[in-house]
Amino acid sequence: MFPGLAAAAAAHRCSWAALCRLGGGRAATRGRSQGWKNVMTFESFTYVVPDIHPHLSIINQVKLYSTNVQKGGQGSQTPKADKVPSLTQTVENIGAELKAPLKQDPLQVRVKAVLKKRDYGSKYTKNNFITGVRAINEFCLKSSDLEQLRKIRRRSPHDDTESFTVFLRSDVEAKALEVWGSLEALAREKKLRKEAEIEYRERLFRNQRILREYGDFLGNTKPRSRAVSVFLKGPGKVVMVAICINGLNCFFKFLAWIYTGSASMFSEAIHSLSDTCNQGLLALGISKSVQTPDPSHPYGFSNMRYISSLISGVGIFMMGAGLSWYHGIMGLLHPQPMESLLWAYCILAGSLVSEGATLLVAINELRRSAQAKGTTFYKYVMESRDPSTNVILLEDTAAVLGVIIAATCMGLTSITGNPLYDSLGSLGVGTLLGVVSAFLIYTNTEALLGRSIQPEQVQRLTELLESDPSVRAIHDVKATDLGLGKVRFKAEVDFDGRVVTRSYLEKQDFDQMMQEIQEVKTPEQLEAFMLKHGENIIDTLGAEVDRLEKELKKRNPEVRHVDLEIL
């Protein structure tokens, strides 16, 4: 009936569903201009098929053509055609295929295990450690009570011990409540013990005083104390020599002023008196500076030298310069005739020799100290590295110059008979003392404010830390001079976490660690594993800090206090 259609169907052997998909794929680019109809054309016959599925694209024209097959000398022959499905069957086949469920792979979703965040609150003390001494003192416990508690070994913050035993504060508090029953009973016991401690200290003080009196009565010789031995060498020796010489000069200058009435001699007498008082103050500062640190002063009392030197500078200005200016101005306003100046010249000559000897002692001490510090004499004096000897040097220099000024002005007065020259000498000595006091006030104030050490020394300390493998960088370096050759060093250290972790792993058993890793199956087990080794790594980091501090102090003995902060 339709030989062309039958021949095409037998040749291609394709399903209608495939043809429909082919036509739909080609029609996807043509838009949806055909609306809701699908057009299928077989040669000259066209059928309209309704759109039965929303996902089926519009099928445009699909045409099948017949083919003439020539064999030998025969004419065209038409092959036997298979049964062609009807239009209704074709539509039903297409609808059934489209309605069939699509095969999809199962959807796999990765669920992220998240550790629940803990709320520690504003105050959390369950992980605080406390030493045995604090537990006994603060909670009124006995050593036997602590034996039943958990003991934990931790790194010691002191250089003399590697580690020490601590207890959990929560365990100690629970034990205290078990022993005393309530917080009120514990508070009452602490109050009673505090009163007993005060009474014990009072009895101890009385007993020590009785022992001192008994020792003095028997003439018992005690070992020389540190405060006494410090005056036998170094700056203490210079101060004691200056006190003795200036005391004698002050006495003889006052006698000369009383005998002659000279304003210049009065200024020199006041000058020697102020020097003697100030040097006594320096001796007190030196004695105080060598005291051992206590809980109230953990960094010691080395700044007492700067404080005493500062007060000495103020005293020189008020007593020495002030009185000299006053007496010189009064001499200019109300000149008085003077007696013979022979004795005054003799006393000034003796003063020049004695003050010069003290000046040489101070210069030699400063030169020796400057060589020990590796700096020049001038720089050592200007930076006031040794405040006590510095004061002696400046005072004796001013004393020698003052004697020369006073002798010159008194000589002019003797030659001319004009007392105004003597008053001008008093003003000159006062001005000299004012300059010395201003220099002392400035240098000691700078030292008390916290003066940095030499830049070369800071660079050397920084390079020592940076050369360590566990350190990445050093920031915010502060190195201050505490006096008495003591240095405080502070820096923020950026540690290399890989090196610190490797240092920890080198001390671990890898087989045991691998076994622990294989046993981790749940988030809780992973948390326990990480907490265990994380805490140990933090302890390793603290040990690295302690090691660097000890190394820094060992190579630089002048560095007494080191504060390394982890960045």
Curated annotation (Swiss-Prot):
<dbReference type="GO" id="GO:0003713">
    <property type="term" value="F:transcription coactivator activity"/>
</dbReference>
<keyword id="KW-0406">Ion transport</keyword>
<comment type="similarity">
    <text>Belongs to the cation diffusion facilitator (CDF) transporter (TC 2.A.4) family. SLC30A subfamily.</text>
</comment>
<dbReference type="GO" id="GO:0015297">
    <property type="term" value="F:antiporter activity"/>
</dbReference>
<dbReference type="GO" id="GO:0010821">
    <property type="term" value="P:regulation of mitochondrion organization"/>
</dbReference>
<keyword id="KW-0812">Transmembrane</keyword>
<feature type="transmembrane region" description="Helical">
    <location>
        <begin position="341"/>
        <end position="361"/>
    </location>
</feature>
<keyword id="KW-0496">Mitochondrion</keyword>
<dbReference type="InterPro" id="IPR009061">
    <property type="entry name" value="DNA-bd_dom_put_sf"/>
</dbReference>
<dbReference type="GO" id="GO:0006829">
    <property type="term" value="P:zinc ion transport"/>
</dbReference>
<dbReference type="GO" id="GO:0031410">
    <property type="term" value="C:cytoplasmic vesicle"/>
</dbReference>
<keyword id="KW-0050">Antiport</keyword>
<keyword id="KW-0813">Transport</keyword>
<dbReference type="InterPro" id="IPR027469">
    <property type="entry name" value="Cation_efflux_TMD_sf"/>
</dbReference>
<comment type="function">
    <text>Mitochondrial proton-coupled zinc ion antiporter mediating the export of zinc from the mitochondria and involved in zinc homeostasis, zinc mobilization as well as mitochondrial morphology and health. In nucleus, functions as a secondary coactivator for nuclear receptors by cooperating with p160 coactivators subtypes. Plays a role in transcriptional activation of Wnt-responsive genes.</text>
</comment>
<dbReference type="InterPro" id="IPR040177">
    <property type="entry name" value="SLC30A9"/>
</dbReference>
<keyword id="KW-0862">Zinc</keyword>
<dbReference type="GO" id="GO:0005385">
    <property type="term" value="F:zinc ion transmembrane transporter activity"/>
</dbReference>
<dbReference type="GO" id="GO:0005783">
    <property type="term" value="C:endoplasmic reticulum"/>
</dbReference>
<comment type="subunit">
    <text>Interacts with GRIP1, ESR1, AR and CTNNB1.</text>
</comment>
<dbReference type="GO" id="GO:0031966">
    <property type="term" value="C:mitochondrial membrane"/>
</dbReference>
<dbReference type="GO" id="GO:0005856">
    <property type="term" value="C:cytoskeleton"/>
</dbReference>
<keyword id="KW-0539">Nucleus</keyword>
<protein>
    <recommendedName>
        <fullName>Proton-coupled zinc antiporter SLC30A9, mitochondrial</fullName>
    </recommendedName>
</protein>
<keyword id="KW-0804">Transcription</keyword>
<feature type="transmembrane region" description="Helical">
    <location>
        <begin position="313"/>
        <end position="333"/>
    </location>
</feature>
<keyword id="KW-0864">Zinc transport</keyword>
<dbReference type="InterPro" id="IPR002524">
    <property type="entry name" value="Cation_efflux"/>
</dbReference>
<dbReference type="GO" id="GO:0005634">
    <property type="term" value="C:nucleus"/>
</dbReference>
<dbReference type="GO" id="GO:0003682">
    <property type="term" value="F:chromatin binding"/>
</dbReference>
<dbReference type="InterPro" id="IPR037129">
    <property type="entry name" value="XPA_sf"/>
</dbReference>
<feature type="transmembrane region" description="Helical">
    <location>
        <begin position="391"/>
        <end position="411"/>
    </location>
</feature>
<keyword id="KW-0472">Membrane</keyword>
<keyword id="KW-1133">Transmembrane helix</keyword>
<feature type="transmembrane region" description="Helical">
    <location>
        <begin position="423"/>
        <end position="443"/>
    </location>
</feature>
<keyword id="KW-0805">Transcription regulation</keyword>
<dbReference type="GO" id="GO:0006882">
    <property type="term" value="P:intracellular zinc ion homeostasis"/>
</dbReference>
<dbReference type="GO" id="GO:0005737">
    <property type="term" value="C:cytoplasm"/>
</dbReference>
<feature type="transmembrane region" description="Helical">
    <location>
        <begin position="238"/>
        <end position="258"/>
    </location>
</feature>
<dbReference type="Pfam" id="PF01545">
    <property type="entry name" value="Cation_efflux"/>
</dbReference>
<keyword id="KW-0256">Endoplasmic reticulum</keyword>
<dbReference type="GO" id="GO:0016922">
    <property type="term" value="F:nuclear receptor binding"/>
</dbReference>
